[in-house]
Structure formats: structure tokens, C-alpha cells
Amino acid sequence: MEKVLKNDWGPLLAPEFEKEYYRKLADFLKEEYSTHVVYPKKEDIFNALEYTSYENTKVVILGQDPYHGPNQAHGLSFSVQPGIKTPPSLLNMYKELRDEYGYDIPNNGYLVKWAEQGVLLLNTVLTVRQGEANSHKGKGWEHFTDRVIELLNEREKPVIFILWGRHAQAKKKLITNTKHHIIESVHPSPLSARRGFFGSKPYSKVNTILANMGEREIDWEIPNL
């Protein structure tokens, strides 16, 4: 298990790697990766934290667990690798973006552009077995990603948390610092998007908050590849 985070998350999260829960998780993952197909690739597990440093995090979009189909997951919530069909929830995110800003829906679901601007695309569970959603639930990742949220909660500079759906909203209890902002609605999944995701304007809400803070706004437009 690669556990060296090369930016400022490294020292902040170093104590987690020594804890009993993480040792058990690492043993479990070693076994899983050697006996099953697991996503994402080992070197991509911590991509959300690698792309978006602690200091540079402006926004957090919380997901659940990685996509479990071939070549989809690469360590960023909701994002898929280039050349892979855009999944339904992300397509609905793009439709809302089109309605807010008039952007064309891109031909890909590769969200690295967001991550590089300070949007932490964090799943609460960072690995999954091929074809088995939630197969790595309850193995220790939740402790680790809760710590990520707690560390952001401790930060002086405000963070905007986007919580879509009940799973993400359950993490509200970790966000106790009133400096931070929470934007929430139902999940963009086709099962729920029409019950309050469409029309919720999360992207422009984020940029209004950032502008009021004197911060650079997020350019949400994803280019075609």
C-alpha cells in the first residue's frame, strides 16, 4: 500500500497510517488486490488528496465508493477516466451545469480540471471490488475519510461542502465549524435528481460564496477530449 502523500496532507494524515484500523485495512487491501480485481489501481487510490492539497481545498464534493466497472475509477469521486462513457449521475451533474451556465455537455467524465482548481472529489470509501458496489464498505476507509473531513473542519479558511444525498449528508455531524458552508440536495442519480437536484444551482452557489470571500471562482466547464 502506497501511503506517502506528497503534499501537505502527508504530515496531517501520517498518524492515521499507524493506527490499528488502518493496519487492518492495509492487510485487507493487500489480500483483495492479490485475489480479486479491485478499483481503482493502487497508485490512484489517493488521487483526490494528491490533486487537491489541504491548503488549496476550496470545495469538497463527497461521493460514496468508486465506480466498479473496468477503467472507470481513478480516485476522484464522480469522475471517470478519459474514453469511458459518462455515468448517469455525472451526466445529470452536467445537465445542471448546462442549465446554470449554458455550458455544452462534454464528451467525457474526466474531472481533473475541477480537482486542480481546489475541488476535493472525495469518496467516503476509496476502493471497491469489480462489479460489487459497496464491497469495501466497513473495512476502515470511513475512519480515514472522516479524518480528512475533520481536518478540513479544523481549518481556519472556510471550505464549501457539497453534500448530495443521505449518505453524504450523514457527514454533516463532522462539520461543526460555523465558518464553513454546506450546500445540500438530493443525489444527482437518475433515481432522485428530479426531486430537488435539478434547479438547485450548486455550482453558482459555490462561486457566489467564493466571490464573497475574495477567492478565485471555479471554472466548472469541462473541455472535450
UniProtKB/Swiss-Prot annotation:
It comes from the Bacteria. Gene3D superfamilies: Uracil-DNA glycosylase-like domain. InterPro entries: UDG_fam1, Ura-DNA_Glyclase_AS, Uracil-DNA_glycosylase-like, Uracil-DNA_glycosylase-like_sf. GO terms for biological process: base-excision repair, AP site formation via deaminated base removal. Its EC number is 3.2.2.27. CDD domains: UDG-F1-like. Belongs to the uracil-DNA glycosylase (UDG) superfamily. UNG family. This is Uracil-DNA glycosylase.
